[in-house]
């Protein structure tokens, strides 16, 4: 979709931000944007779109809220410490506060150009459950749909003569 931010573009922006980040508690890690059931390498981040809500604001304008989850699974061979997971969670609060989402728009010459839009995270939180870090963040996007063209009024001829006059 041209010029539109979607759950997939947000997921890709999160993955890009994580891949370019340096975590003090981690040496290396894998990134997965899809649900992987088996054969994945640890330590790893998994990125999911949890919930998408849409709220109408005005005529053709609305707000989309993308609730995203980033899970960090540490290496099972390493002794996992609560402090290490807290350190990663705290760094995620900084790294994912603003992501940069690339979208395609139509330029003034009619050609498609790639534009990067900053999107701020809200209601960020993390918790540690069974040695897995679960990080939740909401990204809110304002959007507009093209207005439907309403045909111009046509003239209507009115016959004002009563039935008896005919």
Question: What are the language-model segments listed below?
Answer:
Residues 31-42:
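Short acidic low-complexity segments
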Residues 1-30, 53-166:
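Charged, amphipathic alpha-helical segments and their flanking helix caps
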Residues 42-50:
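A short, hydrophobic beta-strand-centered structural micro-motif
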